[in-house]
């Protein structure tokens, strides 16, 4: 894997763990407009930094200060932050001072929530964009698919991921995961209310990421909603090939005489839509069952490519 020729926009990845390392390999293998400029960590013995060095990527184990002090820092146009919500605020402050675009893979939520197939084009000029969460990247497109056909009163998602794919960063950010995903189900997905649940599944051998999406919407045309969901799934497959519907979309009409009680909204009737997803990872660095991590890195790469092609080239 040789570095891309000059003319590509240089990027830095902050965080040399699973997500950062997988993202690095994606940039090097599949980056159309991007080139690795730096891999940044805080553990000199991490596998991610060692792998980056072997691949010829400049590295530092001195964190954000080490990045700023690197000889090639002035060439960095985009930085991906794959650390933690707590660390991101400081990283963002430093990077903004130097005019570097930031793609945030933590649940820090400093910039607008972005899901590539839903709202990326609205936020191409934002200095910082937030990739929501793995569960958000998988499920928000489905809520948006229902929402563009029928007004969604409530959306609830359950993201089930293998315990093995949940590293220390994921585990430390569980509360942020649920809050961030719930908010983005509304602000990006279009639901009036949203709820997110994450399940760490300890099964061996590890299971692939599975997501269940429930929406309660105003009455709508079932065939139109199903077609919208299928079209959206195909759009996500454009950058996450392992994303798929596990079965046909299911519908249930909730009568006004037997309404569902929705927290914050009260008794509601309408059309309940149930969508079942599976996300298989591309296995660039992470195992195929870690689709939850793969969808984050794939979405971040898609955003960076679009930024590079539409904003940085201008």
Swiss-Prot record:
- Residues in a coiled coil are none
Reactions mediated catalytically = acetaldehyde + NAD(+) + CoA = acetyl-CoA + NADH + H(+)
Superkingdom of this entry's organism?
Bacteria
Give binding positions for NAD(+).
Answer: 16-19, 165-173, 292
Q: Which residues form the active site?
A: 134
Any matching Pfam family: AcetDehyd-dimer
Has keyword Oxidoreductase? yes
Ordered alphabetically, the record's keywords are: Aromatic hydrocarbons catabolism, NAD, Oxidoreductase
**InterPro entries for this protein:** Acetaldehyde_dehydrogenase, Acetylaldehyde_DH_C, NAD(P)-bd_dom_sf, Semialdehyde_DH_NAD-bd
GO MF, one example: NAD binding
Q: What is its EC number?
A: 1.2.1.10
Q: SUPFAM superfamilies under this entry?
A: Glyceraldehyde-3-phosphate dehydrogenase-like, C-terminal domain (SSF55347), NAD(P)-binding Rossmann-fold domains (SSF51735)
Q: Which family does it belong to?
A: Belongs to the acetaldehyde dehydrogenase family.
Name listed for the protein in its UniProt record: Acetaldehyde dehydrogenase 1
Q: Which gene encodes it?
A: mhpF
């Amino acid at each position: 894997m040789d570095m891309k020729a000059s003319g590509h926009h240089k990027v830095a990845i902050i965080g040399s763990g699973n997500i950062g390392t997988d993202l690095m390999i994606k940039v090097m293998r599949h980056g159309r407009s991007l080139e690795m400029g730096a891999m940044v960590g805080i553990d000199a013995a991490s596998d991610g930094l060692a792998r980056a060095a072997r691949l010829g990527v400049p590295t530092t184990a001195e964190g954000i200060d080490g990045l700023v002090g690197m000889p090639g820092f002035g060439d960095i146009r985009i930085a991906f932050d794959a650390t933690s919500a707590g660390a991101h605020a400081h990283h963002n402050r430093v990077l903004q001072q130097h005019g570097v675009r930031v793609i945030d893979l933590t649940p820090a939520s400093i910039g607008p929530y972005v899901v590539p197939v839903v709202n990326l084009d609205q936020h191409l000029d934002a200095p910082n964009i937030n990739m929501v969460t793995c569960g958000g990247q998988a499920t928000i497109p489905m809520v948006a698919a229902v929402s563009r056909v029928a007004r969604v009163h409530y959306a609830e998602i359950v993201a089930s991921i293998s315990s093995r794919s949940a590293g220390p960063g994921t585990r430390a950010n569980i509360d942020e995961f649920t809050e961030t995903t719930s908010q983005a189900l509304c602000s990006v997905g279009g639901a009036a209310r949203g709820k997110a649940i994450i399940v760490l599944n300890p099964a061996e051998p590890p299971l692939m990421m599975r997501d269940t999406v429930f929406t309660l919407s105003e009455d709508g045309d079932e065939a139109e909603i199903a077609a919208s969901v299928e079209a959206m799934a195909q759009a996500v497959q454009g950058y996450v090939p392992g994303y798929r519907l596990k079965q046909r979309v299911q519908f249930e009409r909730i009568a006004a005489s037997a309404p569902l009680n929705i927290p914050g909204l009260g008794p509601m009737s309408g059309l309940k839509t149930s969508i079942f997803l599976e996300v298989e990872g591309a296995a660039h660095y992470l195992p195929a069952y870690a689709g939850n991590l793969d969808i984050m890195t794939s979405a971040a790469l898609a955003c960076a490519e679009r930024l590079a092609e539409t904003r940085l080239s201008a």
